[in-house]
From Swiss-Prot:
Disulfide bonds: none annotated. It is found in: Cell inner membrane. Na(+) is not transported, but it plays an essential structural role and its presence is essential for fluoride channel function. This is Fluoride-specific ion channel FluC 1. The keyword Membrane applies. One of its GO terms (cellular component) is plasma membrane.
Length: 126
């Protein structure tokens, strides 16, 4: 484990998190709180961004690993972890593991929402 990688994640994560917060606030003010438009926008644009980075790293950009970590794990991860979920799903599909990709996508959504509900219920009981 290199400290430069940890610092790259921390720096990128802080920028991505601030961007997520500002976008969420902006959409909330613009469209109101009835539907999570900001979150939807963040998840879609974060997935697009990580796809662009992954594609550029694979075919065009020869950047140091710390810069790649800063952009993908840091900025994209801070902006939305949904982008990482999307990239992992794509990699499974690209490797021909379509059933595993489907199971991963369904399990991720269902189990994550289930875990959230469980967490809320635990707090309510306490």
């Amino acid at each position: 484990m290199k400290w430069t990688f940890i610092l790259a994640v921390a720096a990128g994560g802080s920028l991505g998190s601030v961007a997520r917060y500002l976008v969420g606030i902006g959409f909330g003010r613009l469209l109101g709180p009835k539907f999570p438009w900001g979150t939807l926008f963040i998840n879609i644009t974060g997935s697009l961004l990580i796809g662009l980075f992954a594609g550029l790293f694979a075919i065009r950009w020869n950047l140091p690993q710390a810069v790649r970590i800063f952009l993908i794990v840091g900025i994209c991860g801070g902006y939305t972890t949904f982008s990482t979920f999307s990239l992992d799903s794509f990699y499974l599909i690209e490797r021909g593991e379509v059933a595993a990709a489907g199971a991963y996508m369904i399990a991720s959504v269902v189990l994550s929402v289930g875990a959230l509900i469980a967490g809320i219920q635990i707090v309510r009981v306490l």
